[in-house]
Protein backbone atom coordinates (compact mmCIF):
# COMPACT_ATOMS: atom_id res chain seq x y z
CA UNK A 1 0.00 0.00 0.00
CA UNK A 2 1.33 3.40 -0.93
CA UNK A 3 0.47 6.46 1.17
CA UNK A 4 1.16 10.15 0.73
CA UNK A 5 2.08 11.93 3.96
CA UNK A 6 1.64 15.69 4.38
CA UNK A 7 3.13 17.39 7.42
CA UNK A 8 0.51 20.01 8.28
CA UNK A 9 2.50 21.38 11.19
CA UNK A 10 5.74 20.66 13.04
CA UNK A 11 5.87 23.49 15.56
CA UNK A 12 5.92 23.32 19.33
CA UNK A 13 2.79 23.67 21.47
CA UNK A 14 3.03 27.46 21.12
CA UNK A 15 3.74 27.44 17.37
CA UNK A 16 6.62 29.36 15.82
CA UNK A 17 6.82 32.24 16.38
CA UNK A 18 5.14 32.13 19.77
CA UNK A 19 2.98 35.04 20.86
CA UNK A 20 5.27 38.01 21.51
CA UNK A 21 7.18 37.27 18.29
CA UNK A 22 9.40 34.74 20.06
CA UNK A 23 11.26 32.70 17.45
CA UNK A 24 13.46 30.78 19.91
CA UNK A 25 16.48 29.53 17.96
CA UNK A 26 14.64 29.72 14.62
CA UNK A 27 15.75 32.29 12.05
CA UNK A 28 12.75 34.54 11.31
CA UNK A 29 14.18 35.34 7.86
CA UNK A 30 13.58 31.74 6.73
CA UNK A 31 9.87 31.35 5.85
CA UNK A 32 10.07 27.60 6.65
CA UNK A 33 10.57 28.54 10.30
CA UNK A 34 7.00 29.85 10.57
CA UNK A 35 5.45 26.65 11.95
CA UNK A 36 1.94 25.54 12.85
CA UNK A 37 1.27 23.01 15.63
CA UNK A 38 2.08 19.30 15.03
CA UNK A 39 -0.30 17.36 12.81
CA UNK A 40 -0.11 15.20 9.70
CA UNK A 41 -2.39 13.99 6.92
CA UNK A 42 -2.12 10.47 5.48
CA UNK A 43 -3.73 9.74 2.10
CA UNK A 44 -4.01 6.79 -0.20
CA UNK A 45 -6.30 6.22 -3.16
CA UNK A 46 -9.38 5.61 -0.99
CA UNK A 47 -8.75 7.05 2.47
CA UNK A 48 -7.69 10.31 4.17
CA UNK A 49 -6.63 10.20 7.83
CA UNK A 50 -5.77 13.19 10.00
CA UNK A 51 -3.58 12.79 13.08
CA UNK A 52 -4.42 15.38 15.75
CA UNK A 53 -6.71 18.42 15.60
CA UNK A 54 -4.52 21.37 16.52
CA UNK A 55 -5.67 24.94 17.27
CA UNK A 56 -4.27 25.68 13.77
CA UNK A 57 -6.55 23.08 12.11
CA UNK A 58 -8.52 25.55 10.00
CA UNK A 59 -5.37 27.03 8.45
CA UNK A 60 -3.76 23.59 8.06
CA UNK A 61 -6.75 22.18 6.14
CA UNK A 62 -6.95 25.29 3.96
CA UNK A 63 -3.21 25.09 3.20
CA UNK A 64 -3.54 21.41 2.17
CA UNK A 65 -6.86 21.94 0.32
CA UNK A 66 -8.59 19.27 2.42
CA UNK A 67 -12.35 18.94 1.89
CA UNK A 68 -12.93 15.58 3.55
CA UNK A 69 -11.37 13.17 6.00
CA UNK A 70 -12.32 9.58 6.73
CA UNK A 71 -10.97 9.57 10.27
CA UNK A 72 -8.98 11.48 12.85
CA UNK A 73 -6.49 9.77 15.17
CA UNK A 74 -5.66 11.52 18.43
CA UNK A 75 -2.27 11.06 20.09
CA UNK A 76 -3.18 12.69 23.44
CA UNK A 77 -5.32 15.43 24.94
CA UNK A 78 -2.93 18.33 25.39
CA UNK A 79 -4.51 21.48 23.97
CA UNK A 80 -2.11 21.70 21.02
CA UNK A 81 -3.46 18.33 19.79
CA UNK A 82 -7.24 18.63 20.28
CA UNK A 83 -8.30 22.26 20.49
CA UNK A 84 -9.12 22.36 16.77
CA UNK A 85 -11.97 19.87 17.20
CA UNK A 86 -14.64 22.54 16.77
CA UNK A 87 -13.41 23.16 13.20
CA UNK A 88 -14.63 19.66 12.22
CA UNK A 89 -18.09 21.21 11.84
CA UNK A 90 -17.15 22.60 8.45
CA UNK A 91 -15.99 19.16 7.28
CA UNK A 92 -19.28 17.72 8.59
CA UNK A 93 -21.17 20.27 6.49
CA UNK A 94 -19.18 19.49 3.31
CA UNK A 95 -19.24 15.68 3.77
CA UNK A 96 -22.79 15.56 5.19
CA UNK A 97 -21.78 12.94 7.75
CA UNK A 98 -20.19 12.46 11.16
CA UNK A 99 -16.41 12.13 11.57
CA UNK A 100 -14.92 9.04 13.19
CA UNK A 101 -12.34 9.71 15.90
CA UNK A 102 -9.93 6.97 17.04
CA UNK A 103 -8.15 7.15 20.39
CA UNK A 104 -7.51 5.27 23.61
CA UNK A 105 -10.26 4.93 26.21
CA UNK A 106 -8.60 7.56 28.42
CA UNK A 107 -8.23 10.06 25.58
CA UNK A 108 -11.86 9.63 24.49
CA UNK A 109 -13.01 10.13 28.08
CA UNK A 110 -11.04 13.38 28.39
CA UNK A 111 -12.27 14.67 25.01
CA UNK A 112 -15.86 13.92 26.08
CA UNK A 113 -15.32 16.00 29.23
CA UNK A 114 -14.01 18.99 27.27
CA UNK A 115 -16.04 18.71 24.06
CA UNK A 116 -19.18 16.83 25.18
CA UNK A 117 -21.37 18.61 22.60
CA UNK A 118 -19.55 17.03 19.63
CA UNK A 119 -20.73 13.54 20.66
CA UNK A 120 -24.42 14.51 20.88
CA UNK A 121 -26.65 13.67 17.92
CA UNK A 122 -28.04 16.48 15.78
CA UNK A 123 -31.53 17.52 16.85
CA UNK A 124 -34.33 16.39 14.49
CA UNK A 125 -35.15 20.06 13.83
CA UNK A 126 -31.75 20.45 12.14
CA UNK A 127 -32.94 18.43 9.11
CA UNK A 128 -29.42 17.05 8.67
CA UNK A 129 -27.72 20.47 8.81
CA UNK A 130 -24.51 20.28 10.83
CA UNK A 131 -24.84 23.33 13.09
CA UNK A 132 -22.15 21.81 15.34
CA UNK A 133 -19.33 19.29 14.90
CA UNK A 134 -20.45 15.66 15.15
CA UNK A 135 -17.95 12.97 16.08
CA UNK A 136 -18.26 9.21 16.58
CA UNK A 137 -15.74 7.84 19.10
CA UNK A 138 -13.87 4.60 18.36
CA UNK A 139 -11.78 3.16 21.19
CA UNK A 140 -8.43 1.68 20.11
CA UNK A 141 -5.82 -0.61 21.59
CA UNK A 142 -3.18 -2.27 19.44
CA UNK A 143 -4.15 -3.02 15.83
CA UNK A 144 -7.18 -1.62 14.00
CA UNK A 145 -8.22 -0.75 10.44
CA UNK A 146 -9.68 2.30 8.76
CA UNK A 147 -11.04 1.22 5.38
CA UNK A 148 -8.08 -0.57 3.78
CA UNK A 149 -5.38 0.91 6.04
CA UNK A 150 -4.02 -1.23 8.87
CA UNK A 151 -2.80 0.78 11.86
CA UNK A 152 -0.91 -0.28 14.98
CA UNK A 153 -1.23 1.97 18.02
CA UNK A 154 1.22 1.93 20.92
CA UNK A 155 1.81 3.95 24.06
CA UNK A 156 4.76 6.31 24.51
CA UNK A 157 6.18 8.05 27.56
CA UNK A 158 5.36 11.78 27.38
CA UNK A 159 6.85 12.75 30.73
CA UNK A 160 3.98 13.21 33.18
CA UNK A 161 1.54 11.50 30.81
CA UNK A 162 1.38 9.15 27.82
CA UNK A 163 0.85 9.76 24.14
CA UNK A 164 -0.11 7.29 21.42
CA UNK A 165 2.18 6.49 18.51
CA UNK A 166 0.84 5.11 15.24
CA UNK A 167 2.47 2.71 12.78
CA UNK A 168 0.90 2.64 9.33
CA UNK A 169 2.41 0.24 6.82
CA UNK A 170 6.19 0.78 7.08
CA UNK A 171 5.90 4.30 8.52
CA UNK A 172 5.39 5.51 12.11
CA UNK A 173 4.35 8.82 13.65
CA UNK A 174 5.61 9.34 17.19
CA UNK A 175 4.69 12.74 18.58
CA UNK A 176 5.60 14.15 22.00
CA UNK A 177 7.90 11.32 23.14
CA UNK A 178 10.28 11.30 26.09
CA UNK A 179 11.11 7.60 25.79
CA UNK A 180 9.90 4.30 24.33
CA UNK A 181 9.31 1.03 26.16
CA UNK A 182 10.50 -2.28 24.68
CA UNK A 183 7.10 -2.96 23.09
CA UNK A 184 7.16 0.36 21.20
CA UNK A 185 10.76 -0.22 20.10
CA UNK A 186 9.74 -3.56 18.58
CA UNK A 187 6.91 -1.89 16.65
CA UNK A 188 9.06 0.89 15.17
CA UNK A 189 11.97 -1.37 14.22
CA UNK A 190 13.02 -1.52 10.53
CA UNK A 191 10.74 1.25 9.25
CA UNK A 192 11.15 3.06 5.95
CA UNK A 193 10.09 6.34 7.59
CA UNK A 194 9.86 7.53 11.20
CA UNK A 195 8.52 10.97 12.08
CA UNK A 196 9.41 11.65 15.71
CA UNK A 197 9.10 14.64 18.00
CA UNK A 198 11.06 14.25 21.23
CA UNK A 199 9.77 16.27 24.14
PLM regions with names:
Residues 1-174, 178-186:
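Binuclear metal-dependent hydrolase catalytic cores
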Residues 179-199:
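Cap/insert and terminal regions of metallo-dependent hydrolase folds
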Amino acid sequence: MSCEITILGCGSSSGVPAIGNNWGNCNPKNPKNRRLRSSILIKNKNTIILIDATPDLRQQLLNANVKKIDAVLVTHTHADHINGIDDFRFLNVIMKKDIHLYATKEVISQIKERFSYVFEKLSPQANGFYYKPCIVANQISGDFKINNIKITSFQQNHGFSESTGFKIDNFAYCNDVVSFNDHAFRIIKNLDLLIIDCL
